[in-house]
Curated annotation (Swiss-Prot):
Similarity comment text for this entry: Belongs to the histone H2B family.
Complex and partners: The nucleosome is a histone octamer containing two molecules each of H2A, H2B, H3 and H4 assembled in one H3-H4 heterotetramer and two H2A-H2B heterodimers. The octamer wraps approximately 147 bp of DNA.
Biased amino acid composition, Basic residues: 11-32
Cited function: Core component of nucleosome. Nucleosomes wrap and compact DNA into chromatin, limiting DNA accessibility to the cellular machineries which require DNA as a template. Histones thereby play a central role in transcription regulation, DNA repair, DNA replication and chromosomal stability. DNA accessibility is regulated via a complex set of post-translational modifications of histones, also called histone code, and nucleosome remodeling.
Post-translational modification: Monoubiquitination of Lys-118 gives a specific tag for epigenetic transcriptional activation and is also prerequisite for histone H3 'Lys-4' and 'Lys-79' methylation.
Ranges in coiled-coil conformation: none
Glycyl lysine isopeptide (Lys-Gly) (interchain with G-Cter in ubiquitin) crosslink residues: K118
Record-linked InterPro entries: Histone-fold, Histone_H2A/H2B/H3, Histone_H2B, HISTONE_H2B_site
Cellular component terms (Gene Ontology): nucleosome; nucleus
Domain of life: Eukaryota
Protein name: Late histone H2B.L1
Annotated Low complexity bias: 1-10
Length: 123
């Protein structure tokens, strides 16, 4: 039996398309959340003419996640010790003083206080 001739517009398709999963809709890829845009904004505030590679951005993102997890874990422990069920800015401030060394802790506390004040006045 001779093979059917292909229409002129469809010569040698590259890949056969697999049928879509049940439901007939295309699966959407889950978004990866990161601090990339915020790291980039801070970089441009500090050094407007400097760029950052994707590898360096990945390292910075890991660093921010690590510091966030350390602060959250220690603040949770502190609240538990004091029989509190809520982590407030006071716990976070105490933890920052514990985790960060000297001058860095002072700057972090002042920036945090400034951010909380700005937030409460904007409400």
């Amino acid at each position: 039996m001779p093979a059917k001739a292909q229409p002129a517009g469809k010569k040698g398709s590259k890949k056969a398309k697999a049928p879509r999963p049940s439901g007939g809709k295309k699966r959407r890829r889950r978004r990866k959340e990161s601090y990339g845009i915020y790291i980039y904004k801070v970089l441009k505030q500090v050094h407007p003419d400097t760029g950052i590679s994707s590898r360096a951005m990945s390292i910075m993102n890991s660093f921010v996640n690590d510091v966030f997890e350390r602060i959250a874990a220690e603040a949770s422990r502190l609240a538990h010790y004091n029989k509190k069920s809520t982590i407030t800015s006071r716990e976070v401030q105490t933890v920052v003083r514990l985790l960060l060394p000297g001058e860095l802790a002072k700057h972090a506390v002042s920036e945090g206080t400034k951010a909380v004040t700005k937030y409460t006045t904007s409400k």
